């Protein structure tokens, strides 16, 4: 289970028990449709006795994710950043993800001391930062960010599903399930599909109601 070990190590390293250490994670990296969404999360207190079963969002059921989301969002400082489909197509998914992370961090409007990012790459930032491989299984701040980003993006894709029900986005959230791929070939691609991602990149037919 993730805990505050990394956050506490960084606090000791910079000799500041009350520093602002922000965890960052994203969702939607490999999706065929919809934006990439990042969350930035700061816990005012590092108390390992108060974990609320926070863990990598991928290990939680949708019901449990929402339950934890509702518990933690009032008690942490958090912000969301998005990179839209046209930005993913223009800049590539890695750069668009970094843009989403930068937007999430700027949205905190806080004096940030240190940033910990899930993965092996850190976006260009004006703060000290480090990448943490498998960070959503190690750091509570990153795990909380993964939950908030996931719940936020899922809600967004469920809203888009109302307009485009053929693609089943309320269930697959834009990822390449069999049903989604079949619908993509049958109905064509929408404005929410990533043109630089296969198979949308090879489909010329556009969705028309």
Curated annotation (Swiss-Prot):
One of its GO terms (molecular function) is RNA binding. One of its GO terms (biological process) is mismatch repair. Manganese or magnesium. Binds 1 divalent metal ion per monomer in the absence of substrate. May bind a second metal ion after substrate binding. InterPro entries: RNase_HII, RNase_HII/HIII, RNase_HII/HIII_dom, RNaseH-like_sf, RNaseH_sf. Residues 19-209 form the RNase H type-2 domain. It catalyses: Endonucleolytic cleavage to 5'-phosphomonoester. Its EC number is 3.1.26.4. It is found in: Cytoplasm. The keyword Metal-binding applies. It comes from Ehrlichia chaffeensis (strain ATCC CRL-10679 / Arkansas). GO terms for cellular component: cytoplasm; ribonuclease H2 complex. Belongs to the RNase HII family. This is Ribonuclease HII.
């Amino acid at each position: 289970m993730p805990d505050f070990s990394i956050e506490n190590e960084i606090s000791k390293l910079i000799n500041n028990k009350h520093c602002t250490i922000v965890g960052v994670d994203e969702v939607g990296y490999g999706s065929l449709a919809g934006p990439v969404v990042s969350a930035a999360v700061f816990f005012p207190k590092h108390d390992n006795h108060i974990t609320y079963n926070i863990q990598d969002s991928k290990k939680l059921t949708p019901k449990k994710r929402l339950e934890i989301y509702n518990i933690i969002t009032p008690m942490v400082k958090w912000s969301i950043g998005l990179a839209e489909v046209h930005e993913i197509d223009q800049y590539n998914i890695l750069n668009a993800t970094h843009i989403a992370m930068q937007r999430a961090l700027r949205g905190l409007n806080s004096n940030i001391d240190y940033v910990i990012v899930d993965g092996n790459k850190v976006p260009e930032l004006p703060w000290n930062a480090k990448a943490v491989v498998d960070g959503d299984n190690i750091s509570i701040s990153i795990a909380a960010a993964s939950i908030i980003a996931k719940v936020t993006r899922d809600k967004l894709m469920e809203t888009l599903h109302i307009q485009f029900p053929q693609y089943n986005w309320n269930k697959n959230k834009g990822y390449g399930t069999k049903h989604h791929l079949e619908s993509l070939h049958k109905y064509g691609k929408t404005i929410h599909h990533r043109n630089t991602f296969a198979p949308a990149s090879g489909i010329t037919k556009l969705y028309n109601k």
